[in-house]
Amino acid sequence: MLLIFLSSLAILTQVWYNKNMRIQQLHYIIKIVETGSMNEAAKQLFITQPSLSNAVRDLENEMGIEIFIRNPKGITLTRDGMEFLSYARQVVEQT
């Protein structure tokens, strides 16, 4: 459990210090999880679905983790994604 916490803390620290990282991307991740759909999240965020997908892909590349598993039936959080979501919510609540 401590290892998971430290790993998540390292991810969170990376988020804060990465100049290309924006809080908006964290909002995107949270909205995708809330809606369960990239399409619906994009509609509610008033952006295009390709823009949302690119923002998520950029975040995954910057962080070096896969947040979502994408398949024809929808998306699901990966294990790393679940940890990242927890800390993303904390960061968003504090801003």
Regions inferred by a protein language model and the residue ranges of each:
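Short helix-boundary/capping micro-motifs
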Residues: I30-F46
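Helix-turn-helix DNA-binding elements, focusing on the entry/boundary residues of the two helices
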Residues: S37-M38, V56, R70
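The N-cap/first-turn positions of alpha helices
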Residues: R22-Q25, Q49, G74, G81
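Hydrophobic residues on short alpha-helical segments
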Residues: L26-V33, T78, L85
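A short LG(V/I)-centered, amphipathic sequence patch enriched
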Residues: E60-L77
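Short, positively charged and aromatic/hydrophobic N-terminal segments
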Residues: I4, S8-Y17
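Alpha-helical linker/hinge and terminal dimerization helices associated
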Residues: E62-M63, F84-T95
